[in-house]
Regions:
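Active-site alpha-helical segments that house and flank conserved acidic catalytic motifs
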Residues: 14-15, 93, 111, 146, ...
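Short, surface-exposed interaction patches in beta-rich subdomains
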Residues: 138-223
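A short, compositionally biased micro-patch
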Residues: 7, 16-17, 26, 84-88, ...
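Right-handed parallel beta-helix
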Residues: 2-5, 51-125, 134-137, 204-214, ...
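Short acidic/polar N-terminal linker immediately downstream of export determinants
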Residues: 1-47, 69-82, 193-203
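Exposed beta-strand and adjacent loop surfaces of beta-rich binding modules
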Residues: 11, 30-32, 51, 90, ...
Length: 223
């Protein structure tokens, strides 16, 4: 476990091969990083955890795997990374197969995952990309591009900006705050569109939502 003094929000950059990343944001003046093997009884997970390098310089926290000496020795192993950091911090995560969980209020978030589940309580702007897996955001405070090839997308509350949601196979659910004016442009090849937005004012809307799926339903509603 490593601790860094961080009186202001930081930029956290993650690059792990597989496993789980948990980011816990709160009102605090330090950042704590804990890296563990996903299964302490598996040697490849232990080696994967040992390869994770943690650095902090000029407001940027990096948690990333060093390249193994031999890339062709089979599975790279899985790790569990938990980071506690100041609220409002920015996050960038890239991984082949991992679940990414954000607790508390974060700033701008960028996630690129081949396979896994992504869930955030609250973000500012977001760019979330999966090949396979579900994406959930509790409160989305800015513009976003959110997509998965196979999986469901759920935004409990979008506030402002341009939000683009797309999946090839899965349902899309998006909610807006009662005071938010919003418009919806939605399309599904095999499914239904349910538009329950109440505050729609055309081009002057504070929030524009574009949602598309090939196989699935699209539901939009004012909370």
């Amino acid at each position: 476990m490593q601790t860094f003094a961080t009186p202001a929000p930081v930029a956290a950059v993650f690059g792990i091969p597989a496993g789980r990343v948990q980011i816990i944001a709160a009102e605090r003046a330090d950042t704590v990083v804990d890296v563990r093997p996903a299964d302490a009884g598996k040697s490849r997970d232990v080696r994967a955890a040992e390869r994770i390098q943690v650095t902090f310089h000029e407001g940027v926290l990096r948690v990333a795997a060093a390249e193994p000496a031999n890339r062709f020795l089979g599975s790279s192993g899985s790790v569990e990374v938990t980071v506690q950091l100041p609220a409002g911090s920015r996050v960038e995560a890239t991984t082949a197969a991992a679940d990414v969980r954000g607790v508390g209020r974060l700033g701008d978030v960028t996630v690129d995952v081949a396979q896994g589940t992504v869930k955030f309580d609250e973000t500012a702007a977001a760019r979330l990309t999966l090949q396979a897996g579900d994406i959930t955001v509790g409160r989305l405070g800015g513009s976003a591009e959110i997509s998965t090839q196979k999986g469901h997308l759920r935004i409990d509350e979008a506030v402002t900006g341009a939000v683009t949601l797309s999946t090839q196979q899965g349902d899309i659910t998006v909610g807006t705050a009662p005071e938010t004016s919003a418009t919806l442009d939605a399309g599904t090849a095999y499914g239904r569109v349910h538009n329950g937005l109440r505050n729609t004012v055309g081009a002057s809307a504070a929030l524009t939502i574009r949602a598309t799926t090939a196989h699935g339903d699209i539901t939009a509603r004012t909370r």
